[in-house]
Amino acid sequence: MAGFDPTLQPSDDRGHLLTEQSNPRSRRLDQLATNDLVNLFVEEDRRPQEAVAEASEAIAAAVDAISKRLSSGGRLFYLGAGTSGRLGVLDAAECPPTFCSDPELVQGVLAGGTPALLRSSEGLEDLEQAGRDDLDRHGFRQGDCLVGIAAGGTTPYVRGGLSYACSIGALAIAMACVPKDQAPLPCDIDIRLLTGPELLTGSTRLKAGTATKMALNILSTTVMVRLGKVYGNRMVDVAASNSKLVDRSLRILRDLIGVEREEGLALLALSDGSVKLALLMKAANLSKDQARSVLERHDQQLRPSLETCGATLAQL
């Protein structure tokens, strides 16, 4: 257990925040039978989905704004401390294998850096300047997008990052789990996931964390759909970087162009592992270079590329 630092000053009283309030359903939490404990958590975990649904309009606005910037060469950054920051890092890390995106395209910036993935970063989240400095260190610029994640909406590290994004003309998106009037944040788009008081008072890794993960899943996936990395419901830009993903790539080829595994493997070898390229090559009878040129003309969008060539894939 970390020792107490007697010089550390408390923050302003945060008891008014929705995420810090006591949940009346859990006031006897330590007295409940195990089955009742589990059932209570299950019941409360319905709320994150409702909170995300209530924020759908703001999330959609963020998707469109981010997609526009990324299409013009911008990048997406998640910034946060503790659970919020770790969730951003997790979502960013999943983009390259799922969508074959450049690791620079979606980045997670966590207060305290990589060590804070495993251990808390005491003190760093309390500094607005640290948020600015970390973004600057990552080369954050005007054409980029920032999602600043802070469950309680008061984290100085995140506030500093959002202020910096606003000051340079980057897209600033706030994501918090308290009402705007309790913790206003500098931003262009404000996403509020109002999950209510936690069963364990103040432990925002619970409902707030769940809602945040859901919102980030939706945000990154729908942005990638807009960028043309999906055809139907298939991840046609999947990076075949392990045995499981090679198998998934082969099944996508089988389902969309009817090739069996041996021919699928040969197509992947010809297309340098690109499922999207392999699909267009086979469906339109093109060489790799020809297919690549068509995709480039259509901003890597498979559907219009197929239409240009008069080719079709199987109906899903």
Curated annotation (Swiss-Prot):
List, in alphabetical order, the GO biological process terms annotated in this UniProt record: amino sugar catabolic process; N-acetylmuramic acid catabolic process; peptidoglycan turnover
- Give the reaction(s) catalysed: N-acetyl-D-muramate 6-phosphate + H2O = N-acetyl-D-glucosamine 6-phosphate + (R)-lactate
Q: Which residues form the SIS domain?
A: 66-229
InterPro entries, A to Z: Etherase_MurQ, Glucokinase_regulatory_CS, MURQ/GCKR, SIS_dom, SIS_dom_sf
**Top-level class of the enzyme under EC nomenclature:** lyase
Keyword Lyase on entry: yes
What's the domain of life for this entry?
Bacteria
The UniProt keyword set, sorted, is: Carbohydrate metabolism, Lyase
The GO terms describing molecular function are: carbohydrate derivative binding; carbon-oxygen lyase activity; ether hydrolase activity
**One short Pfam family name for this protein?**
GKRP_SIS_N
The yes or no answer to whether the keyword Transmembrane is present is no
Active-site residues per Swiss-Prot or TrEMBL entry = 94 (proton donor), 125
Q: Known EC number(s)?
A: 4.2.1.126
User: Region (Disordered): which ranges?
Assistant: 1-23
Copy the pathway line from the protein's UniProt record. Amino-sugar metabolism; N-acetylmuramate degradation
Q: HAMAP family, per this entry?
A: MurQ
Protein purpose: Specifically catalyzes the cleavage of the D-lactyl ether substituent of MurNAc 6-phosphate, producing GlcNAc 6-phosphate and D-lactate.
What else is noted? A lyase-type mechanism (elimination/hydration) is suggested for the cleavage of the lactyl ether bond of MurNAc 6-phosphate, with the formation of an alpha,beta-unsaturated aldehyde intermediate with (E)-stereochemistry, followed by the syn addition of water to give product.
Q: How does it assemble?
A: Homodimer.
User: Which family, according to the similarity comment?
Assistant: Belongs to the GCKR-like family. MurNAc-6-P etherase subfamily.
Would you tell me the protein name for this molecule? Answer: N-acetylmuramic acid 6-phosphate etherase
